């Protein structure tokens, strides 16, 4: 990933939640994710979003930045959960009991909801970046290393949202 800010989210859904089609965000179309995002934000008991800048990712590495963003997301919940269901990891320095679930976004509706919230939040930011840096095609490639994106990097150089430690492989 060349791009930008890293997002993670935490979502507490009501016990009787009946939101349909919650699944791994990568398996849903962009329009379905947008639709579900609105439902999640309306029906969730609480949503917390954490983010880390490309500079912070470069400074401490992607894994530690991911943990920081996860801790921030949990800290922003308005309700302290009794248990965290996590997608495959145990978050260090969190005192709430945790259950890591492999492929959790396909097995847990709350993990799927958190995955959708984080992805839609990030995609919306990439669409805003596209207005500032249109030559990179962020609205369409979302910052992933498509051929067009790599060509733009080679032609125009890096932007402040590119991760320095990653793009050096390409330019």
Description of each model-found segment:
Residues 1-171:
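RNase H-like, Mg2+-dependent phosphodiesterase core
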């Amino acid at each position: 990933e060349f791009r930008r800010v890293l997002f993670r989210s935490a979502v507490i859904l009501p016990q009787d939640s009946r939101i349909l089609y919650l699944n791994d965000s990568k398996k849903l179309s962009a329009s379905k994710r947008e639709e579900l995002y609105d439902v999640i934000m309306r029906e969730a008991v609480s949503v917390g979003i954490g983010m880390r800048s490309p500079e912070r990712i470069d400074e401490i590495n992607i894994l530690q930045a991911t943990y920081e963003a996860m801790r921030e997301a949990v800290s922003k919940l308005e309700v302290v959960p009794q248990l965290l269901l996590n997608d495959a990891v145990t978050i260090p320095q969190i005192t709430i009991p945790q259950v890591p679930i492999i492929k959790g976004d396909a097995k847990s509706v709350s993990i799927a909801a958190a995955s959708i919230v984080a992805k839609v939040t990030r995609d919306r930011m990439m669409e805003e970046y596209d207005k500032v840096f249109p030559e990179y095609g962020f609205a369409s490639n979302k910052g992933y290393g498509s051929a067009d994106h790599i060509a733009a990097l080679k032609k125009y150089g890096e932007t402040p949202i590119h991760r320095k430690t990653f793009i050096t492989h390409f330019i």
